Amino acid sequence: MRTILPGGEPFFFLGNSGIGCLLLHGLTSAPQEMRGLGEYLAARGHTVLGLRLPAHATRPRAMLHTHWEDWLAAAEDGYHLLENNVRQVIVLGLSLGGAIGLLLASSRPVVGVVAMSTPYEVPPQPRLRFLKALLQPLALLGRVIPFLPKPPPMDYRDREAARNHLTYPVMPVRAITETARLLAVMRARLAEVRVPVLLMHSIHDGGVSPANARSIYEQLGSAQKQLLWLENSGHVLTVEPAHRQVYESAAGFVERWSQPAREGLGEPDEGAATRPRRRASLGR
């Protein structure tokens, strides 16, 4: 009997650069959405570990018994596995994975973090902020109605990518409340993140408002932080038409801030990421 969905398997690529890249996927999704980025980094000689977060890529019911600490513990396991085989570790995460990466960086000596489409709070859309007051009742409701229907994704620029994206067809209520708890801890620790951080976010993200990226950027304790806005993409940056720009920017960041890369690969292209800029549409 197969328990992990096809495409939900973790992946590992052994490199020779001395750099380890820990890749973390998003909520109710799977390692599949990070694999292309992982293969790109591996082709540049880096060791890559793409984790499957607990209760993901199996069945939605597995989420009903999972806590946010389980997700963080899995990322910590991945960090320790890598650090035993490389000289430096960088975390790259999408959505929930980005939040976990930032949280990990507040307590572990990672070299840097690439956080893509990362939420600052739940709900991650300003127009839904009135729902914050419902989080506690929602946790109680989850005992009676464990799943909520997911609306069809509307922000994809690549419809084939939308069809092929491996994710649960429903949203476990428990996953929402646990994500809210994780993000509360992340917000409290952002000032403790002192390593370089690259934030990437689409200005068309329909799942996590771009305002989330601005809030994270402003509260990070790091002196080396960048915010790259993407045009031709929706929420899942790694599979959209802009994915090549995402891959190149991530690799440039990895190779800029890791000493083994500077020794062996030379200086990266300074144009790999842009300085943060204000957009009138972001708001707070």
Stretch-by-stretch model annotation:
Residues 3-59:
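Short, surface-exposed "cap/lid" segments of acyl-processing enzymes
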Residues 37, 195, 209-218:
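Short alpha-helix in the alpha/beta-hydrolase fold that links the catalytic acid
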Residues 93-97, 101:
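Gly/Ala-rich beta-loop-alpha elbow adjacent to hydrolase catalytic centers
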Residues 114-123:
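Active-site nucleophile loop of the alpha/beta-hydrolase fold
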Residues 193, 199-201, 205:
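Short beta-strand/loop motif that positions the catalytic acidic residue
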Residues 214, 218-236:
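Catalytic histidine neighborhood in serine/cysteine hydrolases
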Residues 231-284:
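Catalytic active-site module of serine/aspartate enzymes centered on a nucleophile-bearing elbow/loop
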